[in-house]
């Protein structure tokens, strides 16, 4: 039986691999897949490349993962249809670069570079090689690392004004300020200063913020306004300032107790203590994550083990919208989306739900990303693309996703659109082990960050910060 054919129209947004107009339309076999199409494009009659370039192909904004015939059948199209194939260079895997060892589990990472939020907020540029990685650990300490893996600064211990228990979240607030929070229910503000040679630095505690009655598991910062958001196991969302003069007096009852007394006895310095600008009773269970709306710093989103995502008006300390999912939520990230913002929510059910936060949205969940085999603990947007993100899970992996790499969900998955990871990043600390940890035991990943200049930075139970170079993974050129 003769093999079917279909007319295709090749397009690209990359001028250096643009076909001449007379070659853009072609009749190709319907049994061809991505690899075959890539061979056709590289051929002498088409692009005539000196060495083969691997290509991926999109039809209506989604990657082609089947034969053209299977695509036509799945979409109810006939072979008389002309298919528009947008071609791009194939995705680049994130390569391992380095690991930075700690004394205890690493709960949090942040990056300071010319392209990071702090770098963009700041007035001075960051020279190549002067990027910094901030880590927070269960040993109660913060560390600032250079890209060579040297810890150029370590925070003070509890006896000198540091955290009295494990750190759960730490962020660069500016080039000279860091905020951290953790199991001791406090947020601490640190002055950060580097020596002229940039080989050493100091972290000096300058402010302690009290208000929560449970551990603080997540903070978000907005440098231009010096504002901080916190999510606590007490179910509340806190709103704070890093300016001592603008912060309210602290509730004295919140700083009493054995740990506070012990610190006052042993420390030789006294750090000012202040309270929150507001505390919002948002959730009926532990609040696990909070973020600023990247487009409007007066709006925030919070998540909880009570299955809800709340949209918050920070100015009025009010809840303006509630979205309820089927499972407890552990992590949040705002994605630019395609035309409008999307919220990615990592759940205890091992998947990531993509939520349209607009009140006018017809459905709560726009897409589901499946692949993790344990809790999804952290999510970060691809800095190079509107379509990409990376997630960290308790299964011991980070997974890179492209929202154009999708399929139709099965009945067991609740139907709908399902995304699958395009790359899986394992922990390098397990590479020499012969047995795979069950459920990520010993290598759970707690946090992940994706920076244009530094790469994908992750932290976990293996006491390591791991760096994988990830720029261009999801191809922003499309």
UniProtKB/Swiss-Prot annotation:
InterPro entries in the cross-refs: G-protein_beta_WD-40_rep (IPR020472), NLE (IPR012972), WD40/YVTN_repeat-like_dom_sf (IPR015943), WD40_repeat_CS (IPR019775), WD40_repeat_dom_sf (IPR036322), WD40_rpt (IPR001680), WDR12/Ytm1 (IPR028599)
One GO process term, biological-process aspect: ribosomal large subunit biogenesis
GO molecular function per UniProt: ribonucleoprotein complex binding
Pfam families found in the cross-reference section: NLE, WD40
Ranges where the record places region Ubiquitin-like (UBL) domain: 6-89
Main location as per UniProt: nucleus
Segments annotated as WD repeats: 115-155, 162-200, 211-250, 282-322, 371-411, 440-478
Subcellular location: Nucleus, Nucleolus; Nucleus, Nucleoplasm
Swiss-Prot/TrEMBL keywords: Nucleus, Repeat, Ribosome biogenesis, rRNA processing, WD repeat
GO cellular component: nucleoplasm; PeBoW complex; preribosome, large subunit precursor
Main function: Component of the NOP7 complex, which is required for maturation of the 25S and 5.8S ribosomal RNAs and formation of the 60S ribosome.
Listed PANTHER family: RIBOSOME BIOGENESIS PROTEIN WDR12, WD40 REPEAT PROTEIN 12, 37
Oligomer status and interactors: Component of the NOP7 complex, composed of erb1, nop7 and ytm1. The complex is held together by erb1, which interacts with nop7 via its N-terminal domain and with ytm1 via a high-affinity interaction between the seven-bladed beta-propeller domains of the 2 proteins. The NOP7 complex associates with the 66S pre-ribosome. Interacts (via UBL domain) with mdn1 (via VWFA/MIDAS domain).
Family according to the record: Belongs to the WD repeat WDR12/YTM1 family.
Protein name, entry field: Ribosome biogenesis protein ytm1
Organism listed in the record: Sclerotinia sclerotiorum (strain ATCC 18683 / 1980 / Ss-1)
């Amino acid at each position: 039986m003769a093999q079917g054919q279909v007319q295709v129209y090749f397009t690209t947004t990359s001028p250096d691999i643009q076909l001449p107009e007379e070659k853009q339309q072609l009749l190709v076999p319907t049994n061809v897949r991505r690899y075959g199409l890539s061979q056709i494009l590289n051929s002498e009659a088409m692009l005539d490349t000196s060495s083969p370039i691997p290509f991926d192909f999109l039809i209506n904004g989604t990657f082609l993962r089947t034969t053209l015939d299977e695509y036509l059948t799945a979409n109810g199209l006939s072979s008389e249809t002309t298919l528009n194939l947008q071609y791009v260079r194939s995705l680049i895997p994130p390569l391992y670069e380095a690991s930075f060892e700690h004394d205890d589990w690493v709960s949090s990472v942040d990056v300071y570079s010319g392209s990071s939020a702090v770098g963009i907020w700041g007035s001075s540029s960051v020279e190549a090689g002067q990027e910094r990685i901030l880590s927070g650990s269960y040993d109660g300490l913060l560390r600032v690392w250079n890209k060579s893996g040297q810890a150029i600064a370590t925070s003070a211990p509890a006896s000198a004004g540091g955290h009295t228990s494990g750190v759960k979240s730490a962020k660069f607030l500016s080039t000279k300020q860091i905020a951290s929070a953790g199991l001791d229910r406090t947020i601490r503000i640190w002055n950060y200063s580097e020596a002229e040679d940039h080989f050493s630095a100091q972290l000096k505690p300058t402010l302690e913020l009290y208000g929560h009655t449970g551990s603080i598991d997540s903070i978000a910062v907005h440098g231009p306004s010096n504002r901080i958001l916190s999510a606590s196991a007490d179910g509340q969302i806190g709103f704070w300032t890093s300016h001592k003069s603008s912060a309210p007096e602290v509730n004295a009852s919140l700083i009493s107790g054995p740990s506070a007394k012990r610190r006052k006895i042993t420390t030789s310095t006294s750090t000012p203590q202040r309270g929150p600008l507001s505390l919002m009773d948002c959730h009926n269970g532990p609040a696990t994550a909070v973020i600023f709306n990247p487009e409007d710093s007066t709006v925030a989103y919070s998540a909880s083990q009570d299955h809800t995502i709340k949209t918050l008006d920070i100015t009025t300390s009010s809840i303006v919208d509630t979205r309820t999912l089927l499972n407890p939520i552990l992590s949040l990230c705002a994605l630019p989306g395609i035309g409008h913002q999307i919220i990615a929510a990592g759940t205890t059910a091992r998947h990531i739900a993509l939520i349209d936060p607009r009140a006018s949205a017809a459905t709560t969940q726009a897409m589901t990303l499946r692949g993790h085999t344990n809790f999804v603990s952290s999510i970060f947007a691809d800095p190079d693309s509107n379509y990409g993100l990376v997630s960290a899970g308790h299964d011991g992996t980070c997974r890179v996703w492209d929202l154009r790499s999708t399929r139709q969900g099965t009945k067991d998955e609740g139907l709908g659109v399902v995304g699958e990871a395009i790359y899986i990043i394992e922990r390098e600390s397990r590479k020499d082990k012969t047995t795979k940890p069950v459920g990520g035991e010993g290598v759970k990943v707690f946090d992940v960050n994706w920076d244009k200049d530094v790469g994908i930075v992750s932290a976990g139970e293996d006491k390591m910060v791991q760096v994988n170079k990830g720029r261009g993974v999801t191809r922003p050129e499309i």
